[in-house]
Amino acid sequence: MLTPSRTDQIVETALQAVRSASDWKAVLDELPVPTYITDADGAVTYWNRACVHFAGRQPRLGQDRWCVTWELYTATGDRLLHEDCPMAAAIKGQCEIRGEVAIALRPDGTRRAFTPYPTPLFDQAGNLTGAVNLLIDVTDEQASALNEQAVRCKRLADAIHNKRDAAILSKMADGFAATALALRASTSSNG
């Protein structure tokens, strides 16, 4: 697991390289985290080697839009369309997005939870040229958080007397537990 200060350092290294280094691809290729760049329309124009391992697939330059992953889900397991993902929001809103968690579904069925760091890129005139995104793997942490949420929902369901509300909470607990289990299975099968 990366520490917050190490994550900040990696993000800053990537941003400095993309904004000013003529050899930015070499810098990004050496980063230990999945990193990719899109144009202003969201088409993927570059990805580093770590993206392939993380996404479980080779991204398609110019064809994949907004993200290098196959499918996306919210932190709680609901489907997240690529055009609604944090990278899309960063480009459309022309602002950094921080503090989000998403789950990537790989073609082999395994899942990885991650925190994205999408950051728009601008030319010297202030025009949007694209964005860079780093994906920090938080699978273990997210699985633990989902398990804790499942336990809380189950406890609450057991404590209330309204059967309808208890059933809703039990179903929520089952969903959180299932998503956590899918994440744990992914870490034990191929990390």
Spans of features found by a protein language model:
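Sensory modules in modular signal-transduction proteins
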Residues: 15-39
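N-terminal capping loop/helix in small sensory signaling domains highlighted by a polar->aromatic N-x2-3-F motif
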Residues: 48-51
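Conserved hydrophobic beta-strand signature of PAS-family and PAS-like sensory domains
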Residues: 35, 44-45
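PAS/PAS-like sensory domains across diverse signaling proteins
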Residues: 41-43, 53
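PAS-family sensory domains
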Residues: 2-8, 86, 105, 116-119, 126-138
